[in-house]
């Protein structure tokens, strides 16, 4: 069964359901209301309503897992505020998305959903979303992604020592963990009263879960202050090197289905659930790569040498080599590849696709010692001699690269979440909707904004 188009795009639109206030106001009758002021920007009520609808569409048939409408609206509004702040910070640092880049991204979204851009327009219209609003939301998502990339490049590094330690740890445990969490956030420099309120709230949430009155995912949606609350607090699969050291030992001793905590971390109190675990090495296969050693001679085409002249020259050089001339000596004398000419055309060891598919196809088709027929690439006319082949085990190299990536991802997540907290804490935010209307703030809401001691909603399913 085909999913509704709004569901297919929900993950994009929940996070970045932002539009140009002017454009949206011009399209809305009556004039759109302001849901929140965010520094010099605004979140419109139409943006908030649309994002809430998208969350509800993701929970179709599971409505009892969602919090009351006022709590859901507050959670979604906080997420939209964070998007506005990130976009503002990115644009202030010079991050831009051109119309051409935006058009390519939208064409890709259309293709992924099995339609054309025109078809995308029609489906958006059927779901009640203007195309201009959709373009703005996609632009904002790209901007936020680039801000994260810039943040990672400037602040995140992984040393070889960290990779070595993680590899040793993985060899000992060999496990991966599917985790979920609930965060009861605390502001930086929290007072004793704020800490006590947060402790009371997290204890109440844990009690609901332990009694079976609320499952973990529903509790996360309802009570967590984490950015992934609306995904049930799901953290996905993690290896130990992706888990903060303070929690790694605890998780190693847990059983699937078990909930640990409350745990005090830098962001507040956390409940941690081990959903399931698996052997990271199960099904792992040794990866062997075929590499080639080859020499080549290049004759370029340019202002001083026509296509026909270049082809005639390469034909002559090949004839000399086939007639007994030494390939390396001929390359040193006649090749126009300045990088390899001094080495007799030697390219060293390389995988088949290292110099493009046309070059690789020629090398793969030769036997060791054989010389190819002349062939054309963008660089010009070539002949290549295959010297040898070897099988290289790249499993260890790939494993190190994967470990480096996972450590970097974990560091980025931790640091970027702290960065978002700082960004939110420094911002001027004034809510104009719901029970927080006219509440001006320069920091994120304290945990007491949600019930301090949660009580179960009626008719909640038990585990």
Curated annotation (Swiss-Prot):
Gene Ontology terms describing biological process: chaperone-mediated protein folding; Gram-negative-bacterium-type cell outer membrane assembly; protein stabilization
Disordered: annotated segments: 329-348, 434-463
EC number of this enzyme: 5.2.1.8
Predominant localisation class: periplasm
Signal peptide: 1-25
InterPro entries referenced in this protein's UniProt entry, alphabetically: OMP_Chaperone_SurA (IPR050280), PPIase_dom_sf (IPR046357), PPIase_PpiC (IPR000297), PPIase_SurA (IPR023034), SurA_N (IPR015391), Trigger_fact/SurA_dom_sf (IPR027304)
Alphabetic keyword roster: Chaperone, Isomerase, Periplasm, Repeat, Rotamase, Signal
Lineage top rank: taxon: Bacteria
Pfam families according to UniProt: Rotamase, Rotamase_3, SurA_N
Catalytic reactions on record: [protein]-peptidylproline (omega=180) = [protein]-peptidylproline (omega=0)
Family matches, as PROSITE patterns: PPIC_PPIASE_2
UniProt KW Zinc-finger keyword: no
GO molecular function, one term: unfolded protein binding
UniProt domain PpiC: residue ranges: 174-276, 289-388
Compositional bias per record (Pro residues), positions renumbered to this chain: 453-463
SUPFAM superfamilies: FKBP-like (SSF54534), Triger factor/SurA peptide-binding domain-like (SSF109998)
Compartment(s) of residence: Periplasm
Gene3D superfamilies attached to this UniProt entry: 3.10.50.40, Porin chaperone SurA, peptide-binding domain
One GO cellular component, as annotated: outer membrane-bounded periplasmic space
Ranges of biased composition (kind: Low complexity): 440-452
Domain notes: The PPIase activity resides only in the second parvulin domain. The N-terminal region and the C-terminal tail are necessary and sufficient for the chaperone activity of SurA. The PPIase activity is dispensable for SurA to function as a chaperone. The N-terminal region and the C-terminal tail are also required for porin recognition.
Function: Chaperone involved in the correct folding and assembly of outer membrane proteins. Recognizes specific patterns of aromatic residues and the orientation of their side chains, which are found more frequently in integral outer membrane proteins. May act in both early periplasmic and late outer membrane-associated steps of protein maturation.
Protein name (database record): Chaperone SurA
Source organism phylogeny: Bacteria, Pseudomonadati, Pseudomonadota, Gammaproteobacteria, Lysobacterales
């Amino acid at each position: 069964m085909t999913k509704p188009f709004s569901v297919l795009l929900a993950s994009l639109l929940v996070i970045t359901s932002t539009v140009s206030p002017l454009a949206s106001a011009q399209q809305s009758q009556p004039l759109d209301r302001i849901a929140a002021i965010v520094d010099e920007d605004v979140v419109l009520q139409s943006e908030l309503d649309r994002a809430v609808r998208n969350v509800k569409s993701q929970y179709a048939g599971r409505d009892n897992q969602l919090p009351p409408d006022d709590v859901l609206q507050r959670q979604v509004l906080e997420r939209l505020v964070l998007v506005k702040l990130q976009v503002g910070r990115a644009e202030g640092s010079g991050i831009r998305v051109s119309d051409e880049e935006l058009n390519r991204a939208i064409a890709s979204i259309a293709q992924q959903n099995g339609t054309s851009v025109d078809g995308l327009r029609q489906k958006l219209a059927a779901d009640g979303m203007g195309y201009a609003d959709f373009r703005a939301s996609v632009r904002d998502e790209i901007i936020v992604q680039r801000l994260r990339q810039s943040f990672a490049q400037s602040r995140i590094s992984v040393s070889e020592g960290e990779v070595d330690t993680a590899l040793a740890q993985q060899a000992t445990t060999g496990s991966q963990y599917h985790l979920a969490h609930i965060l009861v956030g605390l502001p930086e420099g929290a007072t004793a009263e704020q800490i006590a309120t947060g402790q009371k709230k997290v204890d109440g949430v844990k009690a609901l879960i332990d009694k079976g009155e609320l499952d973990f995912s529903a509790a996360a949606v309802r009570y967590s202050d984490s950015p992934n609350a609306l995904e049930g607090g799901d953290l996905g699969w993690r290896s130990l090197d992706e888990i903060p050291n303070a929690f790694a030992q605890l998780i190693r001793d847990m059983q699937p289905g078990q909930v640990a905590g409350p745990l005090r971390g830098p962001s507040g109190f956390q409940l941690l659930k081990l959903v399931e675990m698996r052997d990271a090495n199960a099904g792992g296969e040794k990866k062997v790569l075929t590499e080639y050693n080859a020499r080549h001679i290049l004759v370029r085409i340019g202002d001083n040498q026509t296509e026909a002249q270049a082809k005639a020259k390469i034909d002559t050089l090949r004839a000399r080599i086939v007639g007994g001339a030494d390939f390396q000596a001929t390359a040193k004398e006649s090749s126009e590849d300045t990088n390899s000419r001094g080495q007799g055309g030697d390219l060293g060891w390389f995988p088949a696709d290292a110099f493009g598919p046309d070059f690789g196809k020629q090398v793969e088709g030769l036997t060791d010692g054989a010389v190819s027929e002349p062939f054309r690439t963008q660089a010009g006319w070539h002949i290549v001699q295959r010297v040898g082949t070897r099988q290289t085990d790249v499993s260890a190299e790939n494993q190190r690269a994967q470990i480096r990536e996972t450590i970097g991802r974990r560091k980025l997540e931790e640091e970027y979440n702290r960065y978002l907290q700082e960004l939110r804490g420094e911002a001027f935010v004034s809510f104009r909707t719901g029970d927080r209307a006219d509440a001006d703030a320069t920091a994120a809401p304290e945990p007491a904004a949600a019930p301090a001691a949660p009580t179960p909603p009626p008719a909640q399913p038990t585990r």
